[in-house]
Curated annotation (Swiss-Prot), chain A:
This is Acetyl-coenzyme A carboxylase carboxyl transferase subunit beta. Residues 28-290 form the CoA carboxyltransferase N-terminal domain. Its EC number is 2.1.3.15. It is found in: Cytoplasm. Zn(2+) binds at residues 32, 35, 51, 54. Pathway: Lipid metabolism; malonyl-CoA biosynthesis; malonyl-CoA from acetyl-CoA: step 1/1. Belongs to the AccD/PCCB family. Acetyl-CoA carboxylase is a heterohexamer composed of biotin carboxyl carrier protein (AccB), biotin carboxylase (AccC) and two subunits each of ACCase subunit alpha (AccA) and ACCase subunit beta (AccD). Keywords: ATP-binding, Cytoplasm, Fatty acid biosynthesis, Fatty acid metabolism, Lipid biosynthesis, Lipid metabolism, Metal-binding, Nucleotide-binding, Transferase, Zinc, Zinc-finger.
From Swiss-Prot, chain B:
Belongs to the AccA family. It comes from Geobacillus thermodenitrificans (strain NG80-2). GO terms for biological process: fatty acid biosynthetic process; malonyl-CoA biosynthetic process. The keyword Cytoplasm applies. Component of the acetyl coenzyme A carboxylase (ACC) complex. First, biotin carboxylase catalyzes the carboxylation of biotin on its carrier protein (BCCP) and then the CO(2) group is transferred by the carboxyltransferase to acetyl-CoA to form malonyl-CoA. This is Acetyl-coenzyme A carboxylase carboxyl transferase subunit alpha. It comes from the Bacteria. Residues 35-292 form the CoA carboxyltransferase C-terminal domain. It catalyses: N(6)-carboxybiotinyl-L-lysyl-[protein] + acetyl-CoA = N(6)-biotinyl-L-lysyl-[protein] + malonyl-CoA. Its main location: cytoplasm. The gene is accA. PANTHER family: ACETYL-COENZYME A CARBOXYLASE CARBOXYL TRANSFERASE SUBUNIT ALPHA (PTHR42853), ACETYL-COENZYME A CARBOXYLASE CARBOXYL TRANSFERASE SUBUNIT ALPHA, CHLOROPLASTIC (PTHR42853:SF3).
Amino acid sequence: MWKDLFVKKKKYAAIPSEPLRPEVPEGVMTKCPQCKKIMYTKELVKNLRVCLSCGYHHPMPARERIESVLDEGSFREYDAGMTSVNPLGFPGYIEKLEADRRKSGLNEAVVTGEGTLEGHPLAIAVMDSSFRMGSMGSVVGEKIARAVERAHEQRMPFLIFTASGGARMQEGVLSLMQMAKTSAALKRFSNDGGLFISVMTHPTTGGVSASFASLGDYNFAEPGALIGFAGRRVIEQTVREELPEDFQTAEFLLKHGQLDAVIHRHELKEKLAVVLAIHAGGGESGWWRN
Amino acid sequence: MVAELEFEKPLVELRRKIQELKEFMKTADVDLSSEIEKLEARLTKLENEVYANLTPWDRVQIARHPQRPTTLDYIERLFTNFFECHGDRCFGDDEAIVGGIADYDGLPVTVIGHQRGKDTKENLRRNFGMPHPEGYRKALRLMKQAEKFSRPIICFIDTKGAYPGKAAEERGQSEAIARNLFEMAGLTVPVVCIVIGEGGSGGALALGVGNHIHMLENSTYSVISPEGAAAILWKDASLAQRAAETMKITAHDLKTLGVIDEIIPEVKGGAHRNADEQAKEIDRVLRASLKQLLALDGEALVEQRYEKFKQMGQVSFLQETIRAR
């Protein structure tokens, strides 16, 4: 009947779907949190997780990072079996660790080891924000300190990729002390002429930014990475003033003299190789020698 | 009169009663002295009970007491000829940290500490004891100076944390704290740190990489304030009381966790009841500490500090739980 044409269509209740979690790309497609374009995860990964449309640097899993900067097959992992305990008896902590272990396929929020980068041997630590937001507890601190000690013993440079929300609340003051532990290891390494390169990736905040992340002989960061000590919301609440759009981004830090360079992920390996080569010294010509 | 705290209410009432009876005895012609004596005995008993069973949250309240002695209060009582030095030589002078040289019963020392105020005016000047990067850089400058002239360093820790502000971020709050941790680890002179109030996170640790770390009995030291922990962990800042217990932030907790060396006993009711007596307690521990550390040479001091922090933390391998080293 004619009348039927004008009858409103039956309304359907909108059931909210699971919120999209662009930080943890799962499945075939990934949505870019910056430009909102949807792309094949496979292609994104092939592009080192740099958005094909806008250049946004998606968080990179530790294993992929290692693959992307080290020479193929050169990586040897340190302390792979080191895991967290629950020193404060914090309710639910063990379960959370277990869940993240399954989700990320990692034992903890940092992977350490050694390998070569364009032939230069080095010790490396890569943090992964998919494990407890990359937060630093006893294991993260200890693994990093040990990696620095190994670099020291073997007279290799130490390279770190940071990605962390800061100290791990569930390990309380022991997390805080990891800041001192890692910094002390770096100091000793530095005194003996060790080279330390820190590459800050999104996000690097709190206790991690206020310890080893900021202590590089060279401090680099990826474009757009959030880097800072206090959280933006906390600052807005205390100072009650408008913060600039680029506040606490890598570019903001560069402008304020806190970084040596902001480097695109596609150029990272090549630029790191340049720095390593200069430190390795001893060019072919040797004209300066008497 | 010092402000009373929540858990002290029963004591306050009893004290008032005793006072009332005393007043009454003066005006009326009755002898109540035996009554008063009894009540006073009960007060002493009750005091002992209350102060012996302080919860972590009670201690947080004492640590935050507005009249709790500050760094300058202790400097005045422990040292002579304190000469304050200002400025980081880069940007400015941060009054949330004080530092200078002093005489410790004949021993030249460098003293540095967070400084909060006891009233609003003083707190505004001191930024509530929450330093900016220039504060930490001033502290580091003074530590390096101490090292050059072979003076032991004494640090008083008393801050809610490093200041979370725009200017602080622009000037590199993270780097300033990190640099202090890094450089303190390498100092070739004795460093003794004493937590006298709140030890709030990285902002506290930036003066805390010492050979010995001591805490006043009612002070706290933690990765985040109880309120902050409650907000992050349970999305509810009003659960701070529970967080104070869960986070293990008291001197006794830190001793158990192997983070601090000695708990410095406080006068009954807390340091604010008698700063002079409290300073004497600190003096006793500080002397012993320095005496022990001054026997070590520079290299041994650096090594001792390194090992101290290296063993902090707990990890496991496979199924077996061991200490980090």
